[in-house]
Design a protein with these regions (language model features):
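Membrane-embedded alpha-helical bundles that constitute the cytochrome b-like, heme-associated redox core
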Residues: 1-200
Length: 200
């Protein structure tokens, strides 16, 4: 593949399996890769914190601490997904080789759209819940402004949506992981390798 300098190797003398922080036609750059795996860790921690709170009595310090981390890390996901979208808009999307069937590409687009809706919508719903309950919205020592005034009915509806989206999220993340493994081990294309930090 031609590089920016007109040669056939990676730009700037980088090894063949590295393309710097920006995406290339062959693979994702280090920034996209880092954001992807950091968001995976954050999502796992967000889910774990809200599930583990059930092991502690209401009002206890461990339960409240887990809820606090759930709020803050959930909002961190929102920040990172917006950054990831910005990176996506300024760089190419690496090609999948060999090219998958049209139906697989369509399913992949739908899956990614659903994941982005989830990663943006769920933190916003959580922010809305706290706002409508009249509670502070904590974010690593800061208090974010309320999205709306106190409204218990709205808080209840937002909470139901948030919980339903959380269940849907388990399925979406699981399907996303299963699809990556399918492409790697069955289709044997570079879908997963494009997002791995060390190898191509």
């Amino acid at each position: 593949m031609p590089s920016e300098s007109g040669g056939t190797g990676p730009p700037s003398g980088l090894p063949r399996n590295q393309t710097g922080w920006r995406n290339s036609i062959r693979r994702y750059g280090s920034l996209s890769i880092g954001l992807h795996w950091l968001m995976l860790v954050l999502l796992a921690t967000v889910y774990a914190s809200i599930e583990l709170r059930e092991f502690f009595p209401k009002g206890s310090d461990p339960r409240e601490a887990l809820k606090l981390w759930h709020y803050m890390l959930g909002l961190s996901v929102l920040v990172l997904v917006l950054l990831r979208l910005a990176v996506y808009m300024i760089g190419p999307v690496p090609r999948i080789e060999p090219e998958p069937a049209a139906w697989q590409k369509l399913l992949a687009k739908l899956m990614h759209f659903a994941l982005y809706v989830l990663m943006i919508g769920m933190p916003l719903a959580g922010w809305l819940i706290l706002s409508a309950e009249g509670k502070p919205v904590p974010f690593f020592g800061l208090e974010l402004p309320a999205l709306v005034g106190e409204n218990k009915d709205l808080a209840k509806v937002a909470d139901e949506i948030h919980e339903t989206a959380g269940v849907v999220g388990y399925w979406l993340i699981g399907l996303h992981a299963a699809a990556a493994l399918f492409h790697h081990y069955i289709a044997r294309d570079n879908t997963l390798r494009r997002m791995l930090p060390l190898r191509d």
